[in-house]
């Protein structure tokens, strides 16, 4: 059987050797060039392949059509991926008749995603493992072929667990590969309800929070111990790294982060003390704890983890226009969670952002973007990243007020885009899933799908074409004027503070809010055209995390990109959404305060929205760009989102007033 292998790291070397030992013919190996900035403590797949006389390649983009064609010419019977760091396109996955199989470093469906080795230690797990599974479009979601459990000892650190996993992987592959070679490939579906997903870990994630329980801090030390970057803290402006530690139950009443003793070196946490066994000051050498205390000049009672001294690097200033809106207020919360962001915002109200008004890094002005142009231009010039989030984005308004939609959504936003061009500022612009219109593709691709709208006499398309035209103008400014931009397209984001029940009362709200209002007031749930239209509903937390990563823009990977942000797995019809919502409503502890359910009522779209409306049968995103550019995968189930959204709205109702 002929195999093509994608491999990297020690696991890649183990996988290649196991495939050879099982008698497969390896036509080619694809790997990565080592990153000079990374500590390459692990084995080299390229050197192994070269020594074995096997062709080896390290393309920047293995999914490019040129490489897809070259792999097709190799005519593989089977494809293996052993710790290859990039997702493989569906075109590649479909090249092998026997299928494509990936080795993942956890017991799937738990710990899908990146860095499972480190995450299981961070979370204090007592068991992990390795899993061989079929590869599908979605990362780590295919059927399981085989798995092997690995116990995590209390003294395991990242490197010792890494060695255990490599050994388990070799045993697993030695056991299953001969069977697969004979064409017998048993597999069982993963249980989606048990799936968990974790993203990439960064060196800065090793910062210790001494207010956490001592076990949490100790587990962080274990999870990122050498050769990983390490858990670290500060003594004033001096950074130090902790390489090994142990838990001491008694903090002697000391405040978290304070030094209890220097020999041994012990630091108070929330519920105990951490004894630092070995550590390193700055870029120095590794020493035992008491010597580290001496090097840092620590004394009992000293307080660690103070902010580093001013380094001259100012915070990133983010301008959010429409900051009080659904996306704006949630994004503000995410940005303020990070110390290096400062948020400037404008909106016509502040009810959703009242919790931030006293925050020292949040600066708000109440105003209208169509009036306060001087303030906006000044702050575009002042800030680093601009997000013009102001738009009319409810379907009934497209037919009620098409000219107002055009004036606000296109004309006012175009002026802001031109300020960004003038002052050479990066813009992160909210396009919309509506731009795809009546596209017939099974899933909508940012770079390939056609944007199809209806006739001119259907004003519901005014929003879609206003956004599409701005997309094209922004793209042209990028090509001709060097504007730095990213366009993101949200697909039906839902969550708390989506809009308001008052907006639903006048028909100017999102679908789920209207449905909740019907339940609250005991009126029939109206299913427009039977509610058969399908959408992919996305939790606001998933959406905001993706948007935050666009703002971070690691390696400038988002520049000039269009990125869908949605959850393809949460596809449901409006009728299914209503049924799920009703089920959650009936189970809610406040259910007894509201009227009986009044049933469903089928309504024609023309009578509800007016003659200028057209609907769309389905709207499902491809999220390959988000996976590639953001290392992002949505993880929150639709039921969780519905329950949380419902809970927010029900608790916003004045129960006492209703009772009276």
Swiss-Prot record:
Catalytic activity: UDP-alpha-D-glucuronate + NAD(+) = UDP-beta-L-threo-pentopyranos-4-ulose + CO2 + NADH; UDP-4-amino-4-deoxy-beta-L-arabinose + (6R)-10-formyltetrahydrofolate = UDP-4-deoxy-4-formamido-beta-L-arabinose + (6S)-5,6,7,8-tetrahydrofolate + H(+)
Gene3D superfamilies: 3.40.50.12230, NAD(P)-binding Rossmann-like Domain
Cellular component annotations (GO), alphabetically ordered: membrane
One Pfam entry name: Formyl_trans_N
Entry's Gene Ontology BP terms: lipid A biosynthetic process; lipopolysaccharide biosynthetic process; response to antibiotic
Site (Raises pKa of active site His): 140
Single Gene Ontology MF annotation: carboxy-lyase activity
Residues binding NAD(+), per UniProt: 347, 368-369
Pathway: Nucleotide-sugar biosynthesis; UDP-4-deoxy-4-formamido-beta-L-arabinose biosynthesis; UDP-4-deoxy-4-formamido-beta-L-arabinose from UDP-alpha-D-glucuronate: step 1/3; Nucleotide-sugar biosynthesis; UDP-4-deoxy-4-formamido-beta-L-arabinose biosynthesis; UDP-4-deoxy-4-formamido-beta-L-arabinose from UDP-alpha-D-glucuronate: step 3/3; Bacterial outer membrane biogenesis; lipopolysaccharide biosynthesis
Family matches, as NCBIfam families: PRK06988.1, PRK08125.1, PRK11908.1
Subunit structure: Homohexamer, formed by a dimer of trimers.
Family that this chain belongs to: In the N-terminal section; belongs to the Fmt family. UDP-L-Ara4N formyltransferase subfamily. In the C-terminal section; belongs to the NAD(P)-dependent epimerase/dehydratase family. UDP-glucuronic acid decarboxylase subfamily.
PANTHER family xref list: BIFUNCTIONAL POLYMYXIN RESISTANCE PROTEIN ARNA (PTHR43245), UDP-D-APIOSE_UDP-D-XYLOSE SYNTHASE 2 (PTHR43245:SF13)
The protein's name in its UniProt record: Bifunctional polymyxin resistance protein ArnA
Lineage: Bacteria, Pseudomonadati, Pseudomonadota, Gammaproteobacteria, Enterobacterales
């Amino acid at each position: 059987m002929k195999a093509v292998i994608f491999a990297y790291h020690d696991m890649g070397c183990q996988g290649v050797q196991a495939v050879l030992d099982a008698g497969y013919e390896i036509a080619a190996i694809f790997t990565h060039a080592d990153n000079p900035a990374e500590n390459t403590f692990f084995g080299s797949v390229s050197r192994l392949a070269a020594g074995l006389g096997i062709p080896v390649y390290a393309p920047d983009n293995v999914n490019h059509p040129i490489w897809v064609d070259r792999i097709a010419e190799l005519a593989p019977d089977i494809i293996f991926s052993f710790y290859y760091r990039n997702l493989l396109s569906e075109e590649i996955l479909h090249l092998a008749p026997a299928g494509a199989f990936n080795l993942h470093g956890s017991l799937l469906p738990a710990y899908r995603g990146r860095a499972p080795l480190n995450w299981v230690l961070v979370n204090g797990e007592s068991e992990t493992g390795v899993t061989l599974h079929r590869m599908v479009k979605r990362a780590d979601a295919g059927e399981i072929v085989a798995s092997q459990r690995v116990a995590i000892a209390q003294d395991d650190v990242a490197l010792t667990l890494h060695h255990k996993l490599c050994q388990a992987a070799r045993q697993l592959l030695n056991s299953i590969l001969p069977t697969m070679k004979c064409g017998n490939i048993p597999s069982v579906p993963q249980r989606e309800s048990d799936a968990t997903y974790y993203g990439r870990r960064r060196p800065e994630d090793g910062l210790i929070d001494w207010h956490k329980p001592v076990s949490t801090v100790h587990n962080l030390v274990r999870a990122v111990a050498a050769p990983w970057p390490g858990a670290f803290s500060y003594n004033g402006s001096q950074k130090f790294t902790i390489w090994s530690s142990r838990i001491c139950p008694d903090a002697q009443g000391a405040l978290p982060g304070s030094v209890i003793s220097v020999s041994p070196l012990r630091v108070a946490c929330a519920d105990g003390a951490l004894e630092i066994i070995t550590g390193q000051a700055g870029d120095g050498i590794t020493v035992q704890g008491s010597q580290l205390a001496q090097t840092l000049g620590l004394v009992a009672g000293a307080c660690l983890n103070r902010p580093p001294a001013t380094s001259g690097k100012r915070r990133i200033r983010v301008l959010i226009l429409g900051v009080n809106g659904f996306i704006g207020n949630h994004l503000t919360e995410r940005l303020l969670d990070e110390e290096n962001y400062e948020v400037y915002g404008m909106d016509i109200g502040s009810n959703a952002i009242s919790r931030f008004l006293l925050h020292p890094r949040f600066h708000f002005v109440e105003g209208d973007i169509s009036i306060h142009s001087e303030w906006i231009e000044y702050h575009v010039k002042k800030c680093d990243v601009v997000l013009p989030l102001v738009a009319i984005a409810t379907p009934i308004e497209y037919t009620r007020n098409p000219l107002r939609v055009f004036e606000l959504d296109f004309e006012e936003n175009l002026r802001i885009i031109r300020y960004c061009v003038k002052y050479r500022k990066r813009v992160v612009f909210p396009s919309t899933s509506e731009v795809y219109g009546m596209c017939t593709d099974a899933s909508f691709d940012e770079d390939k799908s056609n944007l199809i709208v209806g006739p001119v006499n259907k004003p519901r398309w005014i929003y879609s074409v206003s956004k599409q035209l701005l997309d094209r103008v922004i793209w042209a400014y990028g090509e001709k004027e060097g504007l730095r931009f990213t366009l993101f397209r949200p697909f039906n984001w839902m969550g708390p503070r989506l809009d308001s029940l008052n907006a639903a009362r006048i028909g100017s709200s999102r679908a789920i809010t209207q449905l909740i209002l019907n339940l609250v007031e005991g009126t029939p749930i109206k299913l427009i055209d039977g509610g058969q239209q399908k959408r992919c509903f996305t939790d606001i937390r998933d959406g905001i995390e993706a948007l935050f990563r666009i703002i971070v823009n690691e390696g400038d990977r988002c520049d000039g990109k269009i990125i869908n942000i949605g959850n393809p797995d949460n596809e449901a019809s409006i009728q299914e959404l209503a049924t799920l919502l009703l089920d959650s409503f009936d189970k809610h502890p406040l259910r007894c305060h509201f009227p009986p359910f009044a049933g469903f009522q089928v309504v024609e779209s023309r009578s509800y929205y007016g003659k200028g409306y057209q609907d769309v049968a389905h709207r499902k995103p491809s999220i390959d760009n988000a996976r590639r550019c953001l290392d992002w995968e949505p993880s929150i189930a639709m039921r969780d989102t519905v329950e949380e959204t419902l809970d927010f709205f029900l608790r916003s109702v004045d129960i006492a007033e209703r009772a009276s």
